[in-house]
């Protein structure tokens, strides 16, 4: 998509609307590609250490972007799995952020 003299990628719009840093967006994208995934699987897939991923995933859960749920293992114990919130829910959040930006930009132009 192009806006005046600058090309804007949809990834930038999504990341900006959801308040994601570049490194967080990579995790977000990996979650979008999976139905649900464990910390260990994500760590291996993205080549990120578990501590870094835990911080990012906690932030995602706190910001209601991702669901965390527990799966009990057959041999005892459990593993936490992470799943992205529904895409339609996220689209609504992104569109709301875009509308807010648009209104702010419009007011700024009117005040100019």
PLM region spans:
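Basic amphipathic alpha-helical segments that dock to polyanions
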Residues: 31, 42, 53, 57-63
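A short, conserved structural fragment
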Residues: 61-71
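Pre-recognition alpha-helix immediately N-terminal to the DNA-recognition helix
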Residues: 25-29
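Short, Lys/Arg-enriched N-terminal segment that forms or immediately precedes the first helix
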Residues: 2-18
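Short acidic, hydrophobic short linear motifs in intrinsically disordered regions
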Residues: 36-44
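Amphipathic alpha-helical dimerization/coiled-coil segments
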Residues: 87-112
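Short, cationic-aromatic polyanion-contact patches
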Residues: 13-23, 38, 69-93
């Amino acid at each position: 998509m192009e806006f005046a003299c600058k090309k804007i990628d949809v990834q930038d719009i999504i990341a900006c609307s959801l308040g994601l840093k570049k490194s967080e967006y990579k995790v977000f994208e990996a979650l979008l590609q999976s139905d649900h995934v464990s910390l260990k699987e994500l760590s291996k897939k993205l080549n990120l250490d578990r501590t870094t991923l835990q911080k990012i995933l906690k932030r995602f859960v706190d910001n209601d972007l991702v669901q965390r749920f527990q799966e009990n293992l057959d041999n005892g114990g459990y593993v936490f799995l992470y799943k992205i919130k529904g895409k339609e829910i996220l689209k609504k959040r992104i569109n709301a952020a875009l509308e807010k930006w648009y209104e702010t930009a419009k007011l700024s132009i009117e005040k100019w």
